[in-house]
Structures are given as C-alpha cells and as structure tokens.
C-alpha cells in the first residue's frame, strides 16, 4: 500500500507516466485486490466475539489497511487531470473496487446463504464516483460531463446490473446531503455526473421491467432489490435533495429540464413534488428574460398535469405571458409551436381561457 501511495502521489501534477510505472501500479492494485478477496473469504476482516485479543488486533489492523486500499483508489479518482494514463488507472481502480464489492457481498453476509449486498463499502464507492472528474469537462450545452470514469461505470455496472443501479440511488439518497455539506465545492460535479448517468437511457424498460431487474452483479441479493416502488422512491428523493440543496444557474436549470420529462418524471413515485422546481424555473426564465427556460419549465408542468393530474390553475396564464414576438427568434421555436398546439387542444383548457386567447 505504501508503494502504491508513493506512485499515486507521483502522478499528481505529472504530464506523463511511463508504461512501466503504470503497469506497476495496476499490478499492485491487482495484488491487493486478490489479497483482500482472500481475506474476505477467510473472514479475516470481521471482528468476532470469539476471537482472542491477538486475533482482534490483527483483524483491526487488516481492516485499517482495507480502508486505506479504498482511500488510495478514490484519491486518484479526484484528480482533475485529463491525461489518458490517469483515466486508464481510474478505470482499472473501478474494476478492482467493484470486484471487492462483489466479494464482500458473497463472504460478509450476516448469516450463511443469507442474501446480502455490501452497502457500506458500495456507499464509499458511490460517494467517490459522484464527485469525480474535472469541472472543465462539464459541457455547457447539456451539463453532461466528459468523465471516462463515470462513462465506464455506466457501461460496465450501472446499466448492466440492476442491483448496482438500485443501491446507487439508495446510497445516494442517504449520503447526498452530507456529501454536499462536506464538499460544497463539488456540487457542479455531482450534478454533471448524475445528469450523465441518467440521460443516456431510461432507468428501466417500463414494458419489461421484471426481466431487467433479474440481472445482478451479486449472485444472491435481498428480495427488496426487485421492488420498483422502493427504487422510484430512492430515485425521487435523490433528485429532490439535489434540487433543493443549492441555487441553480440558468444552464443547470435548462440541463435538468431537458431530461426531466423522459428520464426523471417517469421513474418517480410522486412527480408532483417537482412542481416548486418547475415553477421556480419558469419564474427564473421570466426574470432573466430567457423565454426558452420558461418554455421547457411549462413542458414539465404539462407532463404533471396530463399524466399525474396535477392541479395547476395558473398554467395557461403562465403560457399566455410568454406569447411575445421574441418567440419568433428562438432556436426551439418549432418545438414550442408543437407544444402550443398540444396545450391548446387539450381538454384541460377552460372556456374562459379559450375566450381570452381568441380575444
């Protein structure tokens, strides 16, 4: 571990790393992963009441080294270095810690043959992942991030195994507020990483969710993992915590609004909780004279009215307020006109509003 840490410190600020040192680091991580997997299989990382004092001392020391192993990998995840060799080692570290999560889930269950997922260790992984990356790589157009680590996590784990996704939002819900409190400077990274994970595809196929949730990283997971209602609750709470934790910029509002109706709202238990966020988005668009922001906010409100029976009597009043000549110069003009046609042919439209528009 000391040798690995020395190499990690050497990376920081370096413009290059020769292949020999990179291979040395990867070999060290691979060796440590095998050692800790073996220790897990032999229950050497558990403190048991039947252990002698000497055994407890040894187990305590091993646990400290186990924790240090994760710290070493997570440290390099935070490096804001766009060099390929850094990304390569970050991704190698991801594979290693996820193998450990799998091993711990297998060997550290409270009882023999008892379904178990290593939530405490995975919580550390989630916390480290969501603050990873370089702020300079956040795209202004959609607030996604070019973060090789997050993209690899999405491809190999998040989108491939349901238990990984289920526990990601379970742990995020539980730890997000504390992460943002401890690392307030990382808010932009958290938002960009979450948008990147969520926007690529749906959380699960709504027409065939059962078969999707059967694919898991851990062989024997608790039965609750297949409960979509609990997943939606965790997903919903994670987003609400994030949206309420800090005042957002106009670009951040837009990025969230553009994915809201397809990637977020369908996977919440009670999407009407987004009403305040959508209203704030609309109002900010008016204040900043950015009608495009108000338009996409109205689109989100419309989804809640149409699909979840949200009672929002001010909708058409707010729509009427943005019907100005400026609309003709917007990049999303054609999209808005399609939305307007939908709004104006809806059964939600009252006779009074129809008369006002005709007038």
For the regions a language model picked out, list residue spans one by one.
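C-terminal structural cap/anchor segments
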Residues: 342-359
């Amino acid at each position: 571990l000391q040798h690995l840490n020395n190499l990690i410190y050497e990376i920081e600020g370096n413009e290059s790393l020769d292949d020999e040192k990179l291979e040395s680091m990867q070999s060290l991580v691979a060796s440590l992963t095998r050692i800790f997997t073996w220790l897990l299989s032999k229950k050497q990382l558990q403190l048991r009441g039947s252990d002698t004092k000497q055994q407890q001392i040894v187990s305590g020391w091993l646990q400290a080294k186990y924790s240090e192993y994760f710290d070493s990998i997570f440290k390099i995840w935070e490096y804001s270095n766009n060099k390929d060799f850094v990304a390569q080692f970050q991704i190698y570290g991801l594979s290693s810690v996820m193998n450990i999560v799998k091993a711990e889930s297998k060997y550290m269950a409270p009882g023999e043959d008892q379904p178990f997922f290593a939530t405490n260790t995975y919580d550390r992984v989630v916390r480290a992942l969501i603050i990873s990356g370089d702020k300079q790589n956040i795209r202004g157009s959609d607030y996604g991030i070019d973060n090789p680590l997050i993209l690899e996590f999405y491809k190999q784990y998040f989108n491939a195994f349901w238990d990984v996704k289920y526990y990601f939002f379970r742990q995020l819900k539980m730890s997000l507020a504390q992460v943002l409190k401890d690392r307030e400077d990382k808010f932009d990274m958290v938002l960009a990483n979450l948008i990147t994970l969520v926007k690529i595809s749906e959380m699960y196929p709504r027409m065939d969710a059962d078969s999707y949730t059967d694919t898991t990283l851990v062989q024997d997971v608790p039965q609750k993992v297949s409960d979509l209602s609990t997943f939606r609750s965790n997903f919903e709470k994670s987003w609400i915590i994030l949206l309420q934790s800090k005042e957002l910029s106009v670009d951040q509002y837009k990025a969230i609004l553009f994915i809201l109706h397809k990637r977020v709202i369908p996977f919440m238990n009670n999407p009407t909780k987004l009403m305040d966020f959508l209203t704030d988005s609309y109002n900010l668009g008016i204040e900043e004279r950015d009608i495009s922001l108000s338009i996409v906010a109205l689109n989100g409100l419309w989804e809640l009215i149409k699909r979840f029976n949200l009672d929002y009597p001010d909708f058409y009043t707010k729509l009427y307020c943005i019907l100005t000549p400026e609309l003709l110069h917007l990049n999303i003009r054609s999209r808005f006109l399609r939305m307007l046609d939908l709004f104006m042919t809806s059964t939600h439209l009252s006779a009074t509003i129809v008369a006002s528009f005709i007038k």
